[in-house]
Amino acid sequence: MEIKFKTSIILCLLTLLAINSSAQEIVKQFTKDSYSIQKLQDLKKEFGTNKIIPTLYEPQILIALSYFPELKNTTIEFRLKKTNTPLSSRPNLLGLLQSSKKRRYIITISEATNSRLEPILLKNLNFNAQIGVLGHELSHVSDYMNKGFGKMTNLLWIEIFSKKQVDKFETRTDHICINHGLGYQLLDWSSSVRKNLNIEYWRGADNLQYMTKKERYLNPETIIQVLKSKALYNEVTSLNIQKNQHDN
């Protein structure tokens, strides 16, 4: 019994070390010049396996993917399409019947939508905010990876019949994104949405026409408070982004 206990402790420590070693540096502000061409090629080699990535957004997607090491071998297609919702993520329908690790996931990036939502399409966000919302969508995929057929079916039911539960689901997804190290990018996206749409509360594209004080996604003030409560972010007060270029 004692040997088994010690073995369990060792395994836990090794797991924590593995997670720590794969963790990315917390960066407050990414720009198009943050990484060299060689660095982006390295990211593609490490995180681009089983990924279909549109060239237009390749740097942003690769940077976001680098914060989700658990998705290294996951099949994900980033698809450009004209849709009302600026971004969305889901497993392919047949994938619901497969184990989570064998599923193919689709992240749809809208190229055109109605005039009201046009300002928050990915192409109209700044580079840092783009990484933030992509991190949110990858957080969905990471979450889906832990859900079997039953839980995924329940999630579908929630999306159709319970706005309140969807609010909780999206809020939790924002927390997943923050815990993966993209809190500042999520903050940039959250601020950009409210600024670009000239709104105070954001409950998603499908609820834009309704005046409501309910939040589906974390607002900037809440994100700031969450970041302050995380040791991971307290250790970072400022960062010269050019450091990433000098490292290559």
Predicted region positions:
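A metal-dependent hydrolase signature that marks the N-terminal structural subdomain at the beginning
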Residues: S22-S100
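Post-HEXXH active-site segment of zinc metalloproteases
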Residues: N128, D143-T171
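Residues that cap or delimit alpha-helices
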Residues: I61, L65, P69, R116, ...
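Bacterial Sec-dependent N-terminal signal peptides
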Residues: M1-E25
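Active-site scaffold of zinc-dependent metalloenzymes
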Residues: S89-N128, Y144
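Long, well-structured alpha-helical subdomains associated
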Residues: N179-N248
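Active-site recognition of the HExxH zinc-binding catalytic motif
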Residues: G132-M145
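An active-site-proximal "capping" alpha-helix that borders the catalytic cofactor pocket
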Residues: V166-G183
